[in-house]
Amino acid sequence: MRAEVRRGLLDTNILVLRRGIEPAELPDEMAISAVTLAELSAGVHLVDGDDAPARAERARRADVLQRAENEFDPIPFDSEAARMFGRISAAVRASGRTPRLRVADLMIAAVAATAELPLYTTNPDDFAGLEEIVRVVPVRRPLQ
């Protein structure tokens, strides 16, 4: 009897915090979306300042981005995910929340839904109202 292999899509926050996350909380087969690479890339460029702490933060973010690029072949946000994004936006609005403020999160959820993968995140509340569309797997945030 073989154990079932767990597969899942990682939210961007998992990649940012991954070194401190217990490996047993993550799926055996991990995937990311192209949206996650976009968020990580933007993060490198959005660090303000040129002092030592800003340079260190920029380097840390660049390291996370480079590791993600080397480890994963991201799942694209394609036309099927775009259609799913509409359904997800409607579900978020029906739950009383504003989809416009959370576009990247909802695009990642759309990729997870169309790829039929559970979404692993340290921010499960970001995906409230989507329970009928995508399975969200909460992951504990590492202690800072």
Predicted segments, located by residue:
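PIN-domain endoribonuclease scaffold, especially VapC-family toxins
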Residues: 2-8, 18-110, 128-144
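Anion (oxyanion) recognition and catalysis
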Residues: 113
